[in-house]
Amino acid sequence: MECIGKRVKSRSWQRLQAVNKRKKMETVAPVTSPPKKRRQKKPKNYDSDIEDITPTCNDSVPPPQVSNMYSVPNNSVKESFSRIMRDLNVEKKSGPSSSRLTDGSEQNPCLKERSFRVSDLGVEKKCSPEITDLDVGIPVPRFSKLKDVSEQKNTCLMQKSSPEIADLDLVISVPSSSVLKDVSEEIRFLKDKCSPEIRGLVLEKSVPGEIEILSDSESETEARRRASAKKKLFEESSRIVESISDGEDSSSETDEEEEENQDSEDNNTKDNVTVESLSSEDPSSSSSSSSSSSSSSSSSSSDDESYVKEVVGDNRDDDDLRKASSPIKRVSLVERKALVRYKRSGSSLTKPRERDNKIQKLNHREEEKKERQREVVRVVTKQPSNVVYTCAHCGKENTGNPESHSSFIRPHSIRDEIEDVNNFASTNVSKYEDSVSINSGKTTGAPSRPEVENPETGKELNTPEKPSISRPEIFTTEKAIDVQVPEEPSRPEIYSSEKAKEVQAPEMPSRPEVFSSEKAKEIQVPEMPSIPEIQNSEKAKEVQANNRMGLTTPAVAEGLNKSVVTNEHIEDDSDSSISSGDGYESDPTLKDKEVKINNHSDWRILNGNNKEVDLFRLLVNSVWEKGQLGEEDEADELVSSAEDQSQEQAREDHRKYDDAGLLIIRPPPLIEKFGVEEPQSPPVVSEIDSEEDRLWEELAFFTKSNDIGGNELFSNVEKNISANETPAAQCKKGKHDLCIDLEVGLKCMHCGFVEREIRSMDVSEWGEKTTRERRKFDRFEEEEGSSFIGKLGFDAPNNSLNEGCVSSEGTVWDKIPGVKSQMYPHQQEGFEFIWKNLAGTIMLNELKDFENSDETGGCIMSHAPGTGKTRLTIIFLQAYLQCFPDCKPVIIAPASLLLTWAEEFKKWNISIPFHNLSSLDFTGKENSAALGLLMQKNATARSNNEIRMVKIYSWIKSKSILGISYNLYEKLAGVKDEDKKTKMVREVKPDKELDDIREILMGRPGLLVLDEAHTPRNQRSCIWKTLSKVETQKRILLSGTPFQNNFLELCNVLGLARPKYLERLTSTLKKSGMTVTKRGKKNLGNEINNRGIEELKAVMLPFVHVHKGSILQSSLPGLRECVVVLNPPELQRRVLESIEVTHNRKTKNVFETEHKLSLVSVHPSLVSRCKISEKERLSIDEALLAQLKKVRLDPNQSVKTRFLMEFVELCEVIKEKVLVFSQYIDPLKLIMKHLVSRFKWNPGEEVLYMHGKLEQKQRQTLINEFNDPKSKAKVFLASTKACSEGISLVGASRVILLDVVWNPAVERQAISRAYRIGQKRIVYTYHLVAKGTPEGPKYCKQAQKDRISELVFACSSRHDKGKEKIAEAVTEDKVLDTMVEHSKLGDMFDNLIVQPKEADLVEGFSILMP
């Protein structure tokens, strides 16, 4: 062993001599380095820096670990090595040794507080696989104040860095511990998922394997390792003895290695490339530093090459290490080669040296510019509003603006987390001692994605693009004064000193800027891995949860003492060519025009400065032109969901390619027909076939009529069939079969009986046409007129004086060519009437003269229900917007009618967008910019006001129409009702959003359309007060029944059309005494007819257009109304009398009593649904209630349900549908049960039920199903309030009204659901009245009100004047006649009154009075 020690000592001495010679030669030509303030040298005991160097050649054996027990088996070797290292340290006085740096740290106490572990930076695993020629020296401060970082977290951080960084010379002042915590567990799963992407790096050499950092935290593990180290030491010593015998060859190799190691040390000294070692307080961190240094300085070679390993001794206990403060490091080999300094041989020795020289030359400014001209680096610059995200797994890019909330999980940010964890760990770094240079290699051309060379195969590897985002840098000075951008973007250098005055920011966009200070103590990582929270001080709390994508913090002032995170965007002033990795080069705006963002549920809308945007406030300001969404914003903010994109792409690929990946080329479809194809007309049914069908229907009806009333009827009828039923027998009964004989007259075909002679008959009765055919012919003449020209879409010449000015050129009709011929005469007249009231004239050249005229204002279109008021209004709006495109029309209607308006716009192919504010669904015609902003939010995060504001904004910014219901308009724009009682006033908190919407809805509409304008007729209601305060005076009121209950309500409706006329109308009513029509007055008097009505008509004439519905009478088959007075059975009469007694006692709640009577008149069992008073219980006892409960499903216990069941059965035979109305829900539910029980029908198929609780879409679905002639629907049960207005139920030809209401307009509206344009059958209506109940007098009052309405609203249409008001009455009703004549059903009927509301029949209503 003494021999071994002598040989080692001699070889070491020779090695030192060679080192000194080389040092003197290289100090002659020093390399210029960045200016740095040298610390004062302080004497130090160099014995504390002694390192044990044990040469070994066995790769499989880990380096020995030095401990207190080391001197037992090998004391001589230890003493030899100690003397050698003491001599070595004496000779190293000329260079900046680690001990000097250690002493320097003592002089600078800030250094110790800022230092942290190398393992926190992740140097080991970040650079281990492919980093070559990195010489690292690590000075160690004695003490560190930052502690308590677990080995697991440090190890995880070291595994996160990119393994493909080549030729990195790193100068970092390393603290002893990191303040970064709780990061490893959140991002450990990313270790093996994706390969990091570093652009512009050329890797030429393989690197050693992974280095595992050992920890001394467990004493048992340390003891085992020390024991194994002792054993292996002797084995290595024996190998050394054998290697000595090899002679001078091995000596020469050792000399070369010594020279090379000395060169690397000198280079590190000259280039100021050092890495400070860890403090002894953290053994794991110390191991991490040593392994990182060795790994970065190692280079690859062949398997058969020999290696000389420099193994550093093990550290001791923590207390001893604190005293010694020596840079003791301990490494261990794991799976691959140990930490060594590799000997280079052959060609592999030249390239690393050349690279070192190249790095040294880059420190010169002039040479750097030349080098930069040779190597063109593509730098990606992006604005903060268009940030590029790259998936850490697949490399796919996306752009967008994420939110800054701490709970936000940003997609595609995993790679950012991997890189930024290390950067945030540097918040407490003291200073950068030297520069960091990255050799990025050369790139050819201008590829959108850089390529990395594979060190093994030499081939180029396509790596995903580095996300081109603005990443802040690390500044760790005491007083950060200035930040400058370097000239060369591809070779960033960072200069730092004890007091840094100038920091040059590197161009690498992947380094976040973190300003830290001495007192920065803790950086906490929240549970969500993508957004680290920073809790450093009270002032730094505002910085928490800031994202890395552009949110800026206040600038760092001089003398900053708190840790602040900033993400300011660094402008790039370099003249390098711009290239974004997604294919857009030299023009970053191209990318901006195709921004696509994932629709994340928690994303917030950010503006160009990456600040959160208040969508509602932005749209409100845009409406009032305080701010505006421009075209650029519209293009930038359009959103395309990632799922939608992937699905669309998958569908597109499926269409283009087959299973084998080949392109599918489909031939174009063959054209079977050429030219313009006309739509197929329905098959023409001959008269013979139609007559045959009619005969079969009559046969079926006769057969079914024999079955009604029970099964015994058919047997009785069969017995009575005999010779008495022959035609002769019928003639004897007076039932003749008449026909027209032109020579005789109207005579019987069988017996020759002449009922009327030919001379007494009118010529019109000779025709062969029936009444229906005659109406069809008249309608054809009226609609088509002269006109073949009308079929071609041109207006037929009209010689009428009244129409002369209309058809002339220069009128509003020219704005809608071809539409006039499609309108009915009353619609054409109404169209011009609206123009004259709102615009003053129909002549285009005179419109400007009436813009501010007092003659213009609102108008009322009082057309009969079903005569096409909606169609007329749509045509007017279409023409009005052509002349006044800045007009903002608003349509206010009941909620159930808004869908009808939308359907009408589609039906007539109107291109004007219609925005339904009462619906939260979008039509696709909204403003793309506003809709794009809203779609960035998840559906659950969108408020109703934001959705409504998008529609309002779309309505304001384009030529469109806004629709809203009365209830919603009252909610959004309503004013507080001060007249109501205190208990009715709701205290509502001030809502800024509602105030903004109210201001828009009250001030911006230029035209107001009120459908069913009789709805807001109460002067004390909130909706009436709100509508009367709308700024615009251009209003159109649509109502088929403007007169509802009294003249006061009529005056309120007229006042909405012309607010200026309200006082005049009120005074007229007071003078004429027409207020007597209020409820409770019995006598109307003749004064109203003679004086008051005429005065009121004179006031209304200029702005009220009336059409009584003559177009319906001339175009539709006909209408037959009948009041059916029924006799209730015994049980029902008993219950009705009990309630009637209470009613006669003048109970206070009259409406509650009327409700009971209406329910019991339908079925007596419904009394259980009502609240029975104590007096009523005297008559309606428990026994009666139990009996009623048993007969609940028996329709024969009520006269109305019995009539309805038999009636529906007969209508089913003749294939006619029945529409049943009631003002209450309970009767309709009971009738549905009766129908289902008797006919075995299914609810929703044969029986449809509509009530007020249904949504608008469900209502429209039921309507369409019932009107479909091919559907199974037989009966439609409807609530009077739910569907008595606006909707079309032309599928029904039989209408039954179960109860009587006070308002005559309600019944008229209900009847008009079936009797309207589009009806193809005669409509029969039945008003069911129970005898002996208050329903008779109520109906009389209703008839009187209807008569007054007829007198007030006289026909004002030119087309109606001179024509008969009432068309030919329909006298035949075979269904009702059959029921009345039936022997078992005749007892139900008490009386029938046909056409009861005619003027000559009003006085005859006394028959209905009890």
Swiss-Prot record:
Enzyme class: hydrolase
Helicase ATP-binding domain segment(s): 850-1060
One Gene Ontology MF term: helicase activity
SUPFAM superfamilies the UniProt entry points to: P-loop containing nucleoside triphosphate hydrolases
Coiled-coil region(s): 248-278, 356-377
Biased segments, Basic residues type: 1-12
Sequence motif: Nuclear localization signal 2, positions: 328-335
Pfam family, one: Helicase_C
Sequence segments annotated as region (Disordered): 1-74, 87-108, 209-330, 344-376, 428-593, 632-654
Biased composition (Basic and acidic residues): 306-323, 351-376, 450-463, 488-504
Positions of ATP binding: H863, A864, P865, G866, T867, G868, K869, T870
EC number of the protein: 3.6.4.-
Positions occupied by motif Nuclear localization signal 3: 1132-1139
Residue ranges with Polar residues bias: 95-108, 428-446
GO cellular component, as recorded: nucleus
Keywords in alphabetical order: ATP-binding, Coiled coil, DNA-binding, Helicase, Hydrolase, Nucleotide-binding, Nucleus, Repeat
Residue spans of biased composition, Acidic residues class: 245-266
Segments carrying motif Nuclear localization signal 1: 22-29
Matching PANTHER family: SNF2 DOMAIN-CONTAINING PROTEIN CLASSY 2-RELATED (PTHR45821), SNF2 DOMAIN-CONTAINING PROTEIN CLASSY 3 (PTHR45821:SF6)
Family named by the database record: Belongs to the SNF2/RAD54 helicase family.
Record text on subunit structure and interactions: Interacts with NRPD1.
Protein's UniProt name: SNF2 domain-containing protein CLASSY 3
Source organism per UniProt: Arabidopsis thaliana (Mouse-ear cress)
Taxonomic placement: Eukaryota, Viridiplantae, Streptophyta, Embryophyta, Tracheophyta
Encoding gene per record: CLSY3
